[in-house]
Amino acid sequence: MAKDKTIYTCNACGGTNPKWLGKCPHCGEWNTLEESIAEPSGSGKNRFQALAKSSPVSTLADIEAADVERTPTGLDELDRVLGGGIVEGGVVLIGGDPGIGKSTLLLQAVDALSRQMKVLYVTGEESGAQVALRARRLGLDGSQVRVQAEIQLERILATLEAEQPAFCVIDSIQTLYSDQLSSAPGSVAQVRECAAHLTRTAKASGCTTVLVGHVTKEGALAGPRVLEHIVDTVLYFEGDTHSSFRLVRAIKNRFGAVNEIGVFAMTDKGLKGVTNPSAIFLSTHSEPVPGSCVLVTLEGTRPLLVEIQALVDSGGPSPRRLSVGLERDRLAMLLAVLHRHAGVACSDQDVFVNAVGGVRISEPAADLAVLLAIQSSLRGKALPRGFIAFGEVGLAGEVRPAPRGQERLKEAAKLGFSVAIVPKANAPKKPIEGLTIHAVERVEQAIELLRGL
């Protein structure tokens, strides 16, 4: 009997190499090559097919483009992230830490959709009895939900052919295996091939398919990167296990906006949408406190009010710069701008900055709020009640406009905020009722204005 040929496959990009190397020659990642058995030539017949239906060459203007019809899932926050609902034939990949609530969210969505279409829930991690027990604990009806406990791809495809569901959940893609491959479930080859087959089936049948994906210790989706490329939508389920709040964030969406977020609260009856998520990210102080400034940030298309807290304290021989929820390098840059252009020195001080509620802020529009919070903490004087700020700060000390400034200001006014410092380019042409707006062009103007408030 001939000895099986051994190859080494990168678990990050899926590239192969005949011998082990510390660094993948394809993507440059370290310690990602894993030993596997090479597939014999001729195996996997008809595996190499297009994910979508092939068509002859035609002029773009002549192709008839129909509007994408969406079906609401019954969960408003999930619909917001998806762009309004599920799309026929769309493939969604959702990842998150173990126990974060992925299966709970999808079971609730399946139950809600079962009232208007045929649905199928395929579980490879639980038995059918366990799924039923969880559904009863959540108070779900489940009378129209079809459940299959299976990990073999060919049997799942046969079930999809027989049942003809309009919506299907695969929990999870890492547990599936195909008879065409000899590698173990969860390997790069198995994940890639199973996802490709399911995507092909979804496009051909029009069945919307949701794939649940595992994540690595670093928080990235496990499996080859190609998995994220072939699906239509990639969602990340985020949240602290010590908190009851969860965020669903769209990283990729062919049918809607990216970086859109949905906010859920975990209750004893499952996940409930949070209609006013700004309340989560704002602290409830009886009186204004030094070092606290409210920022209006954008998450996708949704304006959110987030409290930025800063603490400036006398440091030792090597002052520290720590930030939670914001980029540390950007904090160091802002402190240099504050010193050079506003004359506020923090070189011998420890500076700590935190975004309340565990939210991650990546947009530069947070710069001005961070600087004002630091200045407030350094002076030991609180900002006025009902104060907000936003704007990007450049190295020359200029305050640049933030995108969609009018929407940010209207959201702040709606929630009862009364004073704002914003970039001059974001100042509204018409006054906003109940909101006093101070427009600035430079950092030193903002700091000087702050002293007079």
State the predicted function of each range.
Residues 128:
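Divalent metal-dependent catalytic cores for phosphoryl transfer on phosphate-bearing substrates
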